[in-house]
Amino acid sequence: MYNNRIIFCKEGSHKMIRKINEGVFYQNGALLSEKEGLARGFSAADGKKKTISYRILSAHNLSGNDEKLKIRFDAMASHDITYVGIIQTSRAGGLEEFPLPYVLTNCHNSLCAVGGTINEDDHVFGLSAAEKYGGVFVPPHQAVIHAYMREMMSGCGKMILGSDSHTRYGALGTMAFGEGGPELVKQLLKKTYDIDAPKTVAVRLTGSPRPGVGPQDVALALIGAVFADGFVKNRVLEFVGDGIANLPIEFRNGIDVMTTETACLSSIWETDEQTRDYLAQHGRPDAYCRLSPEEGAYYDCAVEIDLSAVECMIAMPFHPSLAYTIADVEKNAGDILREAEKRAAEQLGAKDFVLTDKLRDGQLYVDQGIIAGCAGGTYDNLCAAASVLKGYDTGDGAFSLSVYPASQPVNLALMQNGVMQTLLEAGVIQRTAFCGPCFGAGDVPCNKGFSIRHSTRNFPSREGAKPGAGQIASVALMDARSIAATARNHGRLTAATELDVAYEIPAYTFDGGVYEKRCYNGIGKPQHDAALRFGPNITDWPVIDALEDNLLMTLVSEIHDPVTTTDELIPSGETSSYRSNPQKLAEFTLSRKDPGYVARAKAVLSEPIPDSVKKAAAAVIGKTAAEHLQKGSVIYARKPGDGSAREQAASCQRVLGGCANIAQEYATKRYRSNLINWGMLPLLFPDEELPFALGDRILLTGLLSAVENGTEICGYVLRDGEEAKRVTFRLGSLTPDEKKIILAGCLVNSCR
């Protein structure tokens, strides 16, 4: 019936996921093959307009063209390591007030423990911006960004844009997109989010999870099935099926937020009475409407998940897609740990990285457990963890377990109903609403420590270790239930399904007064005369020149890993404190992956072009043009940009004179957009064998017409004593606005 593939999560024996790599139609909650749907009179062209995704996108599209979308969002959100740059850039473009609700949360540099006053200076700036321009300011420790947006801003049929890659509220009927800061700048300057109409993937859920299986287990199984082959890359996931009704809202939210790790563009779910009740409980009953695909809705491909077959999962270092069942790891721990050690040696150069020393009598012991943030710190997850630990303890050894409720209302409810007391009595450490463990700014494990976390990512050094100081640690992702089960056994890896647990989820009461008393809400009430308050670390962007017709690039970094993450391009953790200072932050670019990059990039900027290079260039473009060459640096990476939406992964290169990236492909749409918005050429070179190497100079010619007309770019590799070697690059699809930005040199220039 289908051209499909049964997915076994690594070495597991249970059929969990089926991928259908062809078009399907939706009818009566089931999926029909394209052939069968056409035989029943359905049309793919009409069916595409019957999806939930299409209806929401169309309602927000200002272009009048179903294929070329220009989206205006209903609301936006940023946290304290992105909003300063966004507002500064918008000010340069003429910002007078926020034209849509804009929420500024302070959940990343919340501890104010690095750099003296600089983190709190950013927070003071954020409050002054909310006052001046009319926004919402959520102070530190009140809520992580996505918890607040779910609780206070989501609504059926709405669209929200966030400067964080995990901006996902699909389970609440809201299409949400995580992008780099410049895309938010465009909205603040009353421009649009321009994309080609995305393809849509039906994710059909059936069955019901077994006790002990949580949202992270479902999410990791999905990520493990679709990430490596790009099955859903840059597509919208539309969750349908009768299995949805068997999932509480917070369970759905927990799956939904992790869809970012599949490399999809956005997500949306069918809504029901549980959605209605959640929105009503949070003071927005009018935000509910029933969302479901119409009969005959057409999807470009599909994924089917049997929830009853999903097992307790673990994603091994160093990516969420390295998903195994915990049962597999328990059975084959030595082999699986050695695979992780091999990956560390090959990809990180970490020859001394060891996990097999965590084995005791054939059983795996971990050093730390964390349940935190938008994925882990939900009310239901922490109640489930308390159920597992009730009457037990985490032990008096090296193992520790910390929990981070995602918001103060959640924290308050857990305290009122005794759940937090149960956790504390078991030896659990209570933290605040803080994203630190997700990006390396909180609960950093010991050197060579192995931490299990219900958070969003386990990329290299994402837990906060500093390889440059000889440190290394690692994280495996798990669900809160199995983390609690492991804690109950004092660090011995344990699936929650191995234990007999009576799960109790007390009724949740949301107290919105917590926010009303502490959060500033200035939506629609800008105070134009109010002054912005700047700390000494908050600086303007440097001047960036417009693109010229000829460009001499020097290759200053060459990375051949299968995927390069944004964490490798610009580290998170302590480094994030400097994101309000472009020049200072740029000093950390590629510091963990290629420590020599910054010095090489600076040398390109500061040193004159050698006469021999000018002579070689003159042979191609003429002597006059060669005497006035624009110059800059370029990096090569096979597939850069997986992970965070942080614009600094691109802007830091730009500050150091970066003018382009060369790649076989770009891991995410958002990273490519960040390059474009900072005026950098997103060059494509698909060949495995490279005609250029580290230190080579590449002359690009005829750039202005190539960008304007979308044609191939002609380049020449210039080496002393050798004839210029011709090489061709592609740019890929560019919107008219993106072309304008690249030609102007960056988004700010194009807005002036």
Placement of each model-derived feature along the sequence:
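Fe-S-dependent hydro-lyases/dehydratases of central metabolism
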Residues: Y2-R752
